[in-house]
């Protein structure tokens, strides 16, 4: 195509087109269709104006041969093909001398006879579609639009075609010739299909009224008006020495660009303080399930029926007692709450027909645990705006916490395989379109690697709990509904299994806004003795509620069974995201896909099969104090999934801030590793921004400690 363009068009046109493309950072050698389109458009603009003059009487005449009379004036001013600054200068001077309204976009021509700007369009599509796009883009009554197509059709504003029949025929013939020449070289199809719609970037966006006043108020120092600030910005050359640029911007800024060397960065400072505690909405590695295989009982699938059936599989219940109190709570209330659940479940069984849902009696212990009547009364602002000392509550700074080892163990556990499958293949959605075989193949390989992963169990558990809680919050706003925490899976042998982790009791839930909070009490089974890591369980009251017989290599052993109880809260928006946790599968699949793509582009063929089936190859997984950890491709899939799942389970403002700010430092370090000689200013400020997010969140603290390991190894 490039050769064709150079042969087919006048060298002056080719040169102008190259210049125009370079001005927008485009390469004529690469974007050859665009190159051809620009040349065609330029040629049509020149042909439009050729031979058209205005005589001394102001009439328009056509002079095709010889030296025209010196008194003749060109009918059209050509704006297209000039560089932007020059083009705007011409437009401004025309507007000043003729009083014509200034266009928002650079037009192509000015017609001195009709006193109007003209926008010329050349399209490979339907003329009326292109006409509408142009009209929509320029939104000006005053600019005349004239569209030509390669098929000989044309369309103009109000069907006013400006030129005589013959001049237009000349343009149409030329376009038809270009099309035939392209077709004979096999270039036409690609050229025809490459046309994109009009980009609607406003050149001159007029600001008026309040916005104009705000714009004038918010100008940087030393600028008197929006116009001269705009002129300054337009004239700002983006390359060159940064220090000079900054001092040119403002006298107050003196940023010294410091070279960023291997010795420059220091590790992030992690906070001191008591060890951080568990803050997830449900237990992760410490959860215990009561399960039924191949459920076929009456009402199977109704959560309450399933829960009762699961409870009946356990025979080691005993009189509950508190083994780890909650520091601040009224612990006997937690104990009473569990006893109430047991009693009310027993009541259900004594009924003729088990109900589908169970609302708990509003006892003292539940009212306390669910914060009933605890919220301060809401008062309308109108009624209290005259109160002289009206102010917001003083809130305490959050207490700093140090990194504890349990969160790394939680993460390691999330990456492990369980002996059950937690997603069916269609969980990620069937192919709708006959989309490449490759996509399905990747999905199937990926699913095989993660379907048994514990992080996938957490996804399904999270989806279930959040869905059930949101449903109950809307359907039974005033009730203390008992919600079983359930998940479903398949065993190695393919048998269905229903699991009960414990129960949630929901408080009052009149959720008007996305952020309105619903309180709930969670009660979860576990075999973990809380006294081993009491700091992890700071927010929980833990009861011992039974003894469980476990099969081990040496035979049966009896272990105490615990119940982890705490009050917690969530909101509509958090539940909505919790319900969509399956997205984590998609996110990690996309990350794996980009690894496959990188590999495939090097080898110039699809490497999906090799990628998943070459068991000998190891891949980098992450950094630890020991160095770069490596593992199989399956391990990489599961690690990426676990990270995505933990980002969802431990979502917080601290995580948002840390991710955004630490990424900047990460990019600088990567630039250093790639020998790009990065420079920085105010590195201290960046460290401050990162470290102000390191307060007490276990997942953020763990990520910060991983970041430090990365720094150490990256800069060796």
Curated annotation (Swiss-Prot):
The keyword Glycosyltransferase does not apply. Its main location: host cell. It is found in: Host cytoplasm; Host nucleus. A motif (Nuclear localization signal 2 (NLS2)) lies at residues 184-247. GO terms for molecular function: endonuclease activity; metal ion binding; RNA binding. One of its GO terms (biological process) is viral translational frameshifting. Its EC number is 3.1.-.-. Plays an essential role in viral RNA transcription and replication by forming the heterotrimeric polymerase complex together with PB1 and PB2 subunits. The complex transcribes viral mRNAs by using a unique mechanism called cap-snatching. It consists in the hijacking and cleavage of host capped pre-mRNAs. These short capped RNAs are then used as primers for viral mRNAs. The PB2 subunit is responsible for the binding of the 5' cap of cellular pre-mRNAs which are subsequently cleaved after 10-13 nucleotides by the PA subunit that carries the endonuclease activity. This is Polymerase acidic protein. It comes from Influenza A virus (strain A/Silky Chicken/Hong Kong/YU100/2002 H5N1 genotype X3).
